[in-house]
Amino acid sequence: MMSENTKVLLETKDLSKYFTAKKGFLNRQPSVVKAVDHVSLSVNKGETLGLVGESGCGKSTLGRTILRLIPATEGQVLYNGENLLAYDKKKMWEMRQKLQIIFQDPYSSLNPRMTVYDLISAPLEVYKVGTKAERREMVEEILQEVGLDRQYLNRFPHEFSGGQRQRIGIARALILNPEFVVCDEAVSALDVSVRAQVLNLMRNMQQKKNLTYLFISHDLSVVRHISDRIAVMYLGSVAEVAPKAQLYSNPMHPYTKALLSAIPLPDVKKRRQRIILEGDVPSAYNPPSGCKFHTRCPYATDRCRQEIPVLRQLEKGHQVACHRAEELV
Protein backbone atom coordinates (compact mmCIF):
# COMPACT_ATOMS: atom_id res chain seq x y z
CA MET A 1 0.00 0.00 0.00
CA MET A 2 1.07 3.64 -0.44
CA SER A 3 2.98 5.55 2.18
CA GLU A 4 2.61 9.26 2.83
CA ASN A 5 5.85 10.02 0.98
CA THR A 6 4.81 8.70 -2.39
CA LYS A 7 7.43 8.25 -5.06
CA VAL A 8 6.66 7.59 -8.71
CA LEU A 9 8.16 4.22 -9.65
CA LEU A 10 6.86 3.92 -13.20
CA GLU A 11 5.44 6.49 -15.58
CA THR A 12 4.24 6.37 -19.18
CA LYS A 13 4.38 9.48 -21.35
CA ASP A 14 2.27 9.54 -24.51
CA LEU A 15 2.74 5.76 -24.83
CA SER A 16 1.17 4.34 -27.98
CA LYS A 17 0.89 0.94 -29.61
CA TYR A 18 -0.56 0.75 -33.13
CA PHE A 19 -1.16 -2.40 -35.13
CA THR A 20 -1.53 -2.53 -38.91
CA ALA A 21 -4.04 -4.87 -40.49
CA LYS A 22 -5.86 -5.31 -43.78
CA LYS A 23 -9.62 -4.76 -43.66
CA GLY A 24 -10.43 -7.37 -46.28
CA PHE A 25 -9.38 -9.21 -49.41
CA LEU A 26 -10.38 -6.43 -51.80
CA ASN A 27 -9.10 -3.60 -49.63
CA ARG A 28 -5.33 -3.71 -49.95
CA GLN A 29 -4.82 -0.46 -48.08
CA PRO A 30 -3.66 -1.42 -44.55
CA SER A 31 -5.57 0.11 -41.67
CA VAL A 32 -4.16 1.17 -38.31
CA VAL A 33 -5.60 -0.07 -35.02
CA LYS A 34 -4.73 2.32 -32.20
CA ALA A 35 -4.80 -0.22 -29.37
CA VAL A 36 -3.03 2.18 -27.00
CA ASP A 37 -3.23 5.84 -27.95
CA HIS A 38 -1.00 8.40 -26.19
CA VAL A 39 -1.48 7.09 -22.65
CA SER A 40 0.19 9.00 -19.81
CA LEU A 41 -0.04 7.35 -16.39
CA SER A 42 2.05 7.12 -13.24
CA VAL A 43 2.30 4.32 -10.68
CA ASN A 44 3.64 5.16 -7.22
CA LYS A 45 6.01 2.85 -5.42
CA GLY A 46 4.17 0.39 -3.19
CA GLU A 47 0.69 1.12 -4.55
CA THR A 48 -1.78 -0.79 -6.69
CA LEU A 49 -3.06 1.08 -9.73
CA GLY A 50 -6.19 -0.59 -11.05
CA LEU A 51 -6.75 -0.41 -14.81
CA VAL A 52 -10.34 -1.06 -15.91
CA GLY A 53 -12.44 -0.90 -19.05
CA GLU A 54 -14.48 -3.01 -21.44
CA SER A 55 -12.95 -5.91 -23.36
CA GLY A 56 -10.83 -4.69 -26.25
CA CYS A 57 -10.12 -1.24 -24.80
CA GLY A 58 -6.35 -1.83 -24.74
CA LYS A 59 -5.75 -2.67 -21.06
CA SER A 60 -3.67 -5.81 -21.61
CA THR A 61 -1.85 -4.27 -24.57
CA LEU A 62 -0.83 -1.35 -22.37
CA GLY A 63 0.51 -3.68 -19.68
CA ARG A 64 2.53 -5.71 -22.15
CA THR A 65 3.83 -2.62 -23.91
CA ILE A 66 5.06 -1.24 -20.59
CA LEU A 67 7.04 -4.45 -20.01
CA ARG A 68 8.29 -4.44 -23.62
CA LEU A 69 6.70 -7.83 -24.26
CA ILE A 70 5.43 -6.12 -27.40
CA PRO A 71 7.22 -3.12 -28.95
CA ALA A 72 5.79 0.37 -28.46
CA THR A 73 4.99 2.56 -31.46
CA GLU A 74 5.95 5.78 -29.71
CA GLY A 75 6.19 7.38 -26.29
CA GLN A 76 8.21 6.68 -23.15
CA VAL A 77 8.12 4.26 -20.22
CA LEU A 78 10.07 5.80 -17.35
CA TYR A 79 11.18 3.47 -14.55
CA ASN A 80 12.84 5.38 -11.71
CA GLY A 81 13.27 8.17 -14.24
CA GLU A 82 14.97 6.05 -16.93
CA ASN A 83 13.30 5.30 -20.26
CA LEU A 84 12.94 1.52 -20.64
CA LEU A 85 12.23 1.88 -24.35
CA ALA A 86 15.74 3.25 -24.86
CA TYR A 87 17.43 0.23 -23.24
CA ASP A 88 19.38 -2.17 -25.43
CA LYS A 89 18.66 -5.90 -25.33
CA LYS A 90 21.27 -6.68 -22.64
CA LYS A 91 20.22 -3.89 -20.29
CA MET A 92 16.54 -4.76 -20.70
CA TRP A 93 17.32 -8.41 -19.94
CA GLU A 94 18.90 -7.34 -16.66
CA MET A 95 15.95 -5.06 -15.87
CA ARG A 96 13.41 -7.88 -16.32
CA GLN A 97 14.34 -9.22 -12.89
CA LYS A 98 12.51 -6.19 -11.48
CA LEU A 99 9.54 -6.36 -13.87
CA GLN A 100 7.21 -9.35 -13.89
CA ILE A 101 3.73 -10.34 -15.04
CA ILE A 102 0.97 -12.61 -13.73
CA PHE A 103 -1.12 -13.91 -16.62
CA GLN A 104 -4.87 -14.42 -16.84
CA ASP A 105 -5.00 -18.13 -17.63
CA PRO A 106 -2.92 -20.09 -15.10
CA TYR A 107 -3.07 -23.25 -17.20
CA SER A 108 -1.95 -22.01 -20.62
CA SER A 109 0.78 -19.87 -19.05
CA LEU A 110 2.37 -22.91 -17.36
CA ASN A 111 4.31 -25.46 -19.40
CA PRO A 112 2.39 -28.75 -18.92
CA ARG A 113 5.61 -30.76 -19.30
CA MET A 114 7.39 -29.06 -16.42
CA THR A 115 7.03 -29.83 -12.73
CA VAL A 116 6.16 -27.14 -10.20
CA TYR A 117 9.80 -27.01 -9.11
CA ASP A 118 11.03 -26.58 -12.68
CA LEU A 119 8.46 -23.86 -13.38
CA ILE A 120 9.28 -21.77 -10.32
CA SER A 121 13.04 -22.31 -10.39
CA ALA A 122 13.42 -21.49 -14.10
CA PRO A 123 13.89 -17.72 -13.54
CA LEU A 124 16.53 -18.43 -10.89
CA GLU A 125 18.44 -20.63 -13.31
CA VAL A 126 18.16 -18.11 -16.16
CA TYR A 127 19.65 -15.37 -13.97
CA LYS A 128 22.08 -17.78 -12.25
CA VAL A 129 20.83 -17.03 -8.74
CA GLY A 130 22.42 -19.15 -5.98
CA THR A 131 23.53 -22.76 -5.94
CA LYS A 132 21.24 -25.68 -6.71
CA ALA A 133 20.60 -26.23 -3.00
CA GLU A 134 19.91 -22.53 -2.44
CA ARG A 135 17.52 -22.43 -5.37
CA ARG A 136 15.56 -25.35 -4.00
CA GLU A 137 15.32 -23.66 -0.62
CA MET A 138 14.07 -20.45 -2.27
CA VAL A 139 11.45 -22.36 -4.27
CA GLU A 140 10.20 -24.18 -1.18
CA GLU A 141 9.97 -20.90 0.71
CA ILE A 142 8.00 -19.03 -1.99
CA LEU A 143 5.70 -22.03 -2.46
CA GLN A 144 4.79 -21.97 1.22
CA GLU A 145 4.29 -18.20 1.07
CA VAL A 146 1.64 -18.60 -1.64
CA GLY A 147 -0.14 -21.28 0.38
CA LEU A 148 1.08 -24.53 -1.22
CA ASP A 149 2.97 -27.37 0.45
CA ARG A 150 6.43 -28.37 -0.76
CA GLN A 151 5.12 -31.89 -1.38
CA TYR A 152 3.66 -30.47 -4.62
CA LEU A 153 7.09 -29.66 -6.10
CA ASN A 154 7.26 -32.73 -8.32
CA ARG A 155 3.70 -32.52 -9.63
CA PHE A 156 2.56 -31.16 -12.99
CA PRO A 157 0.12 -28.27 -13.68
CA HIS A 158 -2.78 -30.50 -14.76
CA GLU A 159 -2.87 -32.03 -11.26
CA PHE A 160 -3.97 -28.74 -9.69
CA SER A 161 -7.15 -26.67 -9.52
CA GLY A 162 -7.38 -23.26 -11.18
CA GLY A 163 -6.72 -21.44 -7.92
CA GLN A 164 -3.69 -23.60 -7.13
CA ARG A 165 -2.30 -23.07 -10.64
CA GLN A 166 -2.61 -19.32 -10.23
CA ARG A 167 -0.73 -19.54 -6.93
CA ILE A 168 2.05 -21.33 -8.82
CA GLY A 169 2.00 -18.54 -11.41
CA ILE A 170 2.26 -15.94 -8.63
CA ALA A 171 5.18 -17.83 -7.06
CA ARG A 172 6.98 -17.92 -10.40
CA ALA A 173 6.45 -14.18 -10.92
CA LEU A 174 7.73 -13.29 -7.45
CA ILE A 175 10.68 -15.70 -7.13
CA LEU A 176 13.17 -13.05 -8.35
CA ASN A 177 11.85 -10.46 -5.86
CA PRO A 178 10.63 -7.96 -8.49
CA GLU A 179 9.58 -4.39 -7.75
CA PHE A 180 6.82 -3.95 -10.34
CA VAL A 181 4.25 -6.59 -11.33
CA VAL A 182 1.60 -6.38 -14.06
CA CYS A 183 -1.40 -8.47 -13.00
CA ASP A 184 -3.20 -9.10 -16.29
CA GLU A 185 -6.75 -10.24 -15.40
CA ALA A 186 -5.04 -12.37 -12.75
CA VAL A 187 -8.25 -13.57 -11.07
CA SER A 188 -10.87 -13.32 -13.84
CA ALA A 189 -10.57 -17.02 -14.78
CA LEU A 190 -11.14 -18.18 -11.18
CA ASP A 191 -14.31 -19.11 -9.32
CA VAL A 192 -15.70 -16.36 -7.10
CA SER A 193 -14.87 -18.26 -3.89
CA VAL A 194 -11.25 -18.76 -4.96
CA ARG A 195 -10.95 -15.24 -6.35
CA ALA A 196 -11.16 -13.61 -2.91
CA GLN A 197 -8.47 -15.94 -1.55
CA VAL A 198 -6.06 -15.13 -4.37
CA LEU A 199 -6.73 -11.38 -4.05
CA ASN A 200 -5.96 -11.53 -0.33
CA LEU A 201 -2.80 -13.50 -1.10
CA MET A 202 -1.68 -10.84 -3.58
CA ARG A 203 -2.28 -8.06 -1.05
CA ASN A 204 -0.35 -9.95 1.62
CA MET A 205 2.57 -10.55 -0.74
CA GLN A 206 2.53 -6.89 -1.73
CA GLN A 207 2.86 -5.76 1.88
CA LYS A 208 5.48 -8.38 2.69
CA LYS A 209 7.69 -7.74 -0.35
CA ASN A 210 6.91 -4.03 -0.96
CA LEU A 211 5.54 -4.73 -4.44
CA THR A 212 3.96 -2.28 -6.86
CA TYR A 213 1.05 -3.59 -8.94
CA LEU A 214 -0.61 -2.57 -12.18
CA PHE A 215 -3.83 -4.55 -11.72
CA ILE A 216 -5.71 -5.00 -15.01
CA SER A 217 -9.34 -6.12 -14.86
CA HIS A 218 -12.77 -5.61 -16.42
CA ASP A 219 -14.43 -6.18 -13.02
CA LEU A 220 -14.89 -2.96 -11.03
CA SER A 221 -15.78 -4.86 -7.86
CA VAL A 222 -12.48 -6.77 -7.93
CA VAL A 223 -10.49 -3.61 -8.66
CA ARG A 224 -12.17 -1.84 -5.75
CA HIS A 225 -11.04 -4.61 -3.40
CA ILE A 226 -7.33 -4.37 -4.18
CA SER A 227 -6.53 -0.95 -5.70
CA ASP A 228 -5.34 2.33 -4.21
CA ARG A 229 -6.00 4.34 -7.37
CA ILE A 230 -7.97 3.44 -10.50
CA ALA A 231 -7.56 4.40 -14.17
CA VAL A 232 -10.46 3.90 -16.60
CA MET A 233 -9.69 3.17 -20.27
CA TYR A 234 -11.91 3.52 -23.31
CA LEU A 235 -10.84 2.65 -26.87
CA GLY A 236 -7.12 2.89 -26.14
CA SER A 237 -7.23 6.15 -24.17
CA VAL A 238 -7.51 7.00 -20.48
CA ALA A 239 -10.85 8.56 -19.55
CA GLU A 240 -10.37 9.09 -15.82
CA VAL A 241 -7.83 8.51 -13.03
CA ALA A 242 -8.59 8.95 -9.34
CA PRO A 243 -8.03 7.54 -5.85
CA LYS A 244 -10.37 4.62 -5.26
CA ALA A 245 -12.68 6.38 -2.79
CA GLN A 246 -13.06 9.44 -5.04
CA LEU A 247 -13.76 7.42 -8.17
CA TYR A 248 -16.53 5.36 -6.59
CA SER A 249 -18.13 8.25 -4.66
CA ASN A 250 -17.71 11.00 -7.26
CA PRO A 251 -17.04 9.74 -10.81
CA MET A 252 -16.63 12.64 -13.24
CA HIS A 253 -16.50 11.02 -16.67
CA PRO A 254 -19.84 9.88 -18.19
CA TYR A 255 -18.28 6.54 -19.15
CA THR A 256 -17.11 5.90 -15.60
CA LYS A 257 -20.56 6.79 -14.28
CA ALA A 258 -22.14 4.28 -16.65
CA LEU A 259 -19.72 1.53 -15.62
CA LEU A 260 -20.32 2.12 -11.91
CA SER A 261 -24.10 2.17 -12.37
CA ALA A 262 -23.93 -1.43 -13.61
CA ILE A 263 -22.40 -2.78 -10.36
CA PRO A 264 -25.03 -4.71 -8.34
CA LEU A 265 -25.72 -3.39 -4.83
CA PRO A 266 -25.52 -5.93 -1.96
CA ASP A 267 -28.61 -4.37 -0.32
CA VAL A 268 -31.64 -5.39 -2.41
CA LYS A 269 -33.71 -2.55 -0.88
CA LYS A 270 -31.40 0.09 -2.32
CA ARG A 271 -31.77 1.31 -5.86
CA ARG A 272 -29.22 2.96 -8.13
CA GLN A 273 -30.06 4.83 -11.31
CA ARG A 274 -28.84 2.64 -14.15
CA ILE A 275 -27.19 4.48 -17.03
CA ILE A 276 -27.74 2.62 -20.30
CA LEU A 277 -25.24 3.49 -23.01
CA GLU A 278 -26.74 3.63 -26.49
CA GLY A 279 -25.04 1.90 -29.42
CA ASP A 280 -22.00 -0.34 -29.65
CA VAL A 281 -18.36 0.39 -28.94
CA PRO A 282 -16.91 2.00 -32.10
CA SER A 283 -14.45 0.01 -34.18
CA ALA A 284 -10.79 0.47 -33.29
CA TYR A 285 -10.12 0.42 -37.05
CA ASN A 286 -12.04 3.67 -37.44
CA PRO A 287 -12.42 5.44 -34.08
CA PRO A 288 -14.61 8.54 -33.86
CA SER A 289 -13.14 12.01 -34.23
CA GLY A 290 -12.82 14.22 -31.17
CA CYS A 291 -13.76 12.45 -27.95
CA LYS A 292 -13.90 8.71 -28.66
CA PHE A 293 -16.86 8.36 -26.32
CA HIS A 294 -19.08 10.97 -27.99
CA THR A 295 -21.00 8.39 -30.10
CA ARG A 296 -22.41 6.84 -26.90
CA CYS A 297 -22.41 9.85 -24.58
CA PRO A 298 -25.80 11.47 -23.79
CA TYR A 299 -24.06 14.79 -23.02
CA ALA A 300 -21.98 15.11 -26.22
CA THR A 301 -21.76 18.50 -27.95
CA ASP A 302 -20.21 19.68 -31.21
CA ARG A 303 -16.98 20.38 -29.34
CA CYS A 304 -16.90 16.75 -28.16
CA ARG A 305 -17.28 15.56 -31.75
CA GLN A 306 -14.43 17.70 -33.02
CA GLU A 307 -11.87 18.24 -30.23
CA ILE A 308 -9.95 15.51 -28.39
CA PRO A 309 -10.25 16.10 -24.62
CA VAL A 310 -7.06 16.36 -22.57
CA LEU A 311 -6.63 14.36 -19.36
CA ARG A 312 -6.63 17.18 -16.79
CA GLN A 313 -6.80 17.47 -13.02
CA LEU A 314 -10.06 18.78 -11.55
CA GLU A 315 -9.48 17.79 -7.93
CA LYS A 316 -6.37 16.69 -6.06
CA GLY A 317 -5.30 13.39 -7.64
CA HIS A 318 -8.47 13.25 -9.78
CA GLN A 319 -7.93 13.54 -13.55
CA VAL A 320 -10.59 13.33 -16.23
CA ALA A 321 -10.63 13.61 -20.03
CA CYS A 322 -13.99 15.28 -20.61
CA HIS A 323 -14.82 18.75 -21.92
CA ARG A 324 -17.95 19.00 -19.76
CA ALA A 325 -16.73 17.35 -16.56
CA GLU A 326 -17.31 20.45 -14.39
CA GLU A 327 -20.92 20.74 -15.57
CA LEU A 328 -21.74 17.07 -14.98
CA VAL A 329 -20.45 16.74 -11.41
Task: Describe each region flagged by the PLM.
Residues 182, 186-190, 194-272:
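P-loop NTP-binding/switch modules centered on Walker-like glycine-rich loops
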Residues 5-8, 21-27, 32, 243-329:
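Short catalytic/signature loops enriched in Gly
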Residues 83, 133-151, 257-261:
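Conserved ABC ATPase "signature" region
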Residues 175-179:
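A short, proline-enriched helix->beta-strand linker immediately N-terminal to the Walker B motif
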Residues 67:
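Helix-to-loop junction immediately C-terminal to a conserved catalytic motif
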Residues 156-160, 164:
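Conserved ABC ATPase signature
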Residues 75-83:
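Conserved ABC transporter NBD signature motif
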